[in-house]
Each structure stands twice: as C-alpha cells, then as structure tokens.
C-alpha cells in the first residue's frame, strides 16, 4: 500500500491553531470494517447533497412540505422568467482574435442552426443548485494523550479510493495534541482538490473573493463573472458559496441591475432568493418597466407558492386573479413599494393603450 507524505509549512489547515505550523498529508486505502469512521451526514444516494433551501417538515409533523428550488413547478416559473436571449448567451468571449466564419445557408439550414443554438442555450442556462449551508463537522474520534508533543505538525489521512463519492470519503486529521478528528469541510475541500483536481478550482481561495475585490467587480457590473467563479471554486452548500451569492444579489437589488443576470443561469437563483426574503418589489418594477408583464405575474405567482398563507396569496385565490390583476393584488397587500408598483402599472397600461390606438 503506497503512502504519500508531504511537508507544507505555509498552509495552516486549522484556522484556530497558533502559528503557521506544518501539515502532513497521508493517503490511504479504505479503512477496515469496524473502524470508528462513519460517512458524513447530509448526503443521499451516491453522495449528492439532498438539502434544499426550504427543507421538509420533520417526520411525523402535520406541517405541509414547503416548496423547494428543484420542484418542477418552481423550476418552470424560474426558467420562464430567465429569458432566452441568444445574443447575450452566446456573446463573444475574450480570447485569441480569429477571423470570423461566414456560411451560406438555405432557409431550412438556417432554421436547423437556430434550433441547435436554442438547445445549446438551454444547456448553458441550467441553474446551479440552491442548498442549505452544510452542518459544521466537529466530530472527535479519539484523544490519544500519549502522542501529545511527538509531532509539531498535523497529519491529514485521506482515503483516495476512486470508487468512493467525495461526500463519503474518509478524511481525518491527527493534531499535535494527539486528538484524532474528522476533517472540517474546508479541509476536506482542499484535500479533495489536491488528489482529485477539478478544472477551474484552486486549492486556496482566490483573492478575487476578498471584500475589496468583490466591490471592484460589482462597480464594473461584473456580477456574472463573480457568480461563475464562485460556482467553479466552492461547493454549493458551503458558507462561502452562499455568502458570495447573497452578497451579489443584494448589490444587484441595491442598484436595480437585475438585467445583468437576465438570460444567464444565475437569474433563477436570484429570483428565488428575493422571493424567499419577501423582497421582490424592485425586480417586479423592473420587469413591468421592461414590458415583461408575464414575467412579473410569474414572479408574484412564485411568491404565492412560497408564501401561501400571506394576505396576497389568500386574496388572489379568492378573486381567482391572473396577469395584471395578480400584480395589483400583491401591490395592495404585501408590497413594500405598493404605490410605486401601482404607478408603474398605470404607466404601462397607458403606454399599451396609446400603442394600440396608434396601430
């Protein structure tokens, strides 16, 4: 059985330890049956996280299960609101300059090429998952005081068997104090990236995610770039992933830059976040001002799905409200900027009437 031992003086895996210290990595095969190690909590099937943003009610509870991000109805509404702007989805990327390619096509060939482009666009618009933050790992397996002081650095033992899903992979840390514990999520992510490198991900968090650098990116309207880098670097249920996404959404809401995420894979997650926070007023006004009234109605519909006991949902149900009427019900009941929404709706209706009369 091959073993790997590496000394690393600049990387301190344990945030609470004093000094830089040293860390040793050791890779081993699967532990013997009967060992103390147990699979990590919060996984299902082949190790895929199964926690949604809105978790199910506890077993045996009479509470009705709340909708989750991956529910079919929710996904259908979010996909509809996201939009399908092919020019934006396939906008030129920064790369080596090459001469453009021109093709002469028949009408049938053009229609087929357009169909293929739409299918490729739908793949690019597949939304990243939205999960609850993972539970911290604080499991201590043994306290071997006899080993205290024998080493000055930590040992990290990793099961590198290829057949094991990463979520179920055994990774433990031996502290200089003699404590044997399960590795924290951050330690696990780093070790897995060392042994099983993922394209676009670094072992250490890139400096772009520092607060001052994020603010610079936001000021340049590069919110999509931030979110794309975040998806590549972090696990979807990690604290950093959730923090960066929420911070980006809040900046977009603060300055009304919702259109930056429209026709991108991140629009659905943003809409879901605002609906959960009951902060859809800004996005709703933006949709109406851009003549996306159907999307605005879908946003209110999603709001009612997530908050069925609210006054808006109850009145809309009683009135069987749809379309503009659905938006008006929300504006009069639960909207934080109800008067502004009503004025925006009025301006939209007047413009629509004028346009109809002119034609």
Swiss-Prot record:
It is found in: Mitochondrion. It comes from the Eukaryota. GO terms for cellular component: mitochondrial inner membrane; mitochondrial small ribosomal subunit. InterPro entries: Ribosomal_mS22 (IPR019374). One of its GO terms (molecular function) is structural constituent of ribosome. Disulfide bonds: none annotated. Keywords: Mitochondrion, Ribonucleoprotein, Ribosomal protein. Its main location: mitochondrion. One of its GO terms (biological process) is mitochondrial translation. The keyword Ribonucleoprotein applies. Component of the mitochondrial ribosome small subunit (28S) which comprises a 12S rRNA and about 30 distinct proteins. Belongs to the mitochondrion-specific ribosomal protein mS22 family. This is Small ribosomal subunit protein mS22. It comes from Bos taurus.
């Amino acid at each position: 059985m091959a073993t790997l031992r590496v000394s690393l003086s600049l990387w301190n895996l344990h945030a609470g330890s004093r000094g830089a210290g040293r860390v040793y990595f050791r890779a081993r095969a699967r532990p013997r049956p009967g060992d103390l190690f147990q699979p990590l909590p919060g996984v299902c099937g082949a190790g895929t996280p199964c926690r949604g943003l809105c978790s199910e009610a506890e077993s045996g509870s009479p509470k009705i299960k709340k909708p989750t991000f991956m529910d079919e109805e929710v996904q259908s509404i979010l996909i509809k609101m996201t939009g399908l702007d092919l020019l934006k989805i396939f906008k030129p990327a920064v790369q080596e300059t090459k001469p453009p390619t021109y093709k002469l096509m028949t009408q049938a060939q053009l229609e087929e090429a357009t169909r293929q482009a739409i299918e490729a666009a739908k793949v690019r618009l597949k939304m990243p998952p939205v999960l609850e933050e993972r539970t911290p790992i604080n499991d201590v397996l043994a306290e071997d005081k006899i080993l205290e002081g024998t080493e000055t650095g930590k040992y990290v033992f990793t099961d590198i068997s290829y057949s094991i899903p990463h979520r179920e992979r055994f990774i433990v840390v031996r502290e200089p104090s003699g404590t044997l514990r399960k590795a924290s999520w951050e330690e696990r992510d780093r070790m897995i990236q060392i042994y099983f490198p993922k394209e676009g991900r670094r072992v250490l968090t890139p400096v772009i995610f520092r607060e001052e650098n994020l603010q610079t990116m936001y000021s340049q309207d590069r919110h999509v770039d931030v979110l794309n880098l975040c998806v590549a670097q972090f696990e979807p249920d990690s604290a950093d992933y959730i923090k960066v996404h929420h911070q980006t959404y809040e900046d977009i809401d603060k300055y009304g830059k919702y259109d930056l995420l429209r026709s991108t894979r991140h629009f659905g997650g943003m809409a879901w976040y605002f609906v959960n926070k009951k902060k859809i007023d800004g996005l709703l006004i933006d949709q109406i001002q851009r003549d996306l009234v159907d999307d605005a109605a879908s946003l209110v519909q999603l709001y009612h799905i997530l908050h069925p006991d609210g006054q808006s949902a109850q009145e809309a149900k009683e009135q069987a409200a749809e379309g503009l009427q659905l938006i008006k019900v929300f504006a009069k009941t639960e909207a934080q900027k109800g008067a502004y929404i009503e004025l925006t709706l009025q301006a939209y209706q007047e413009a629509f009437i004028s346009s109809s009369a002119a034609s």
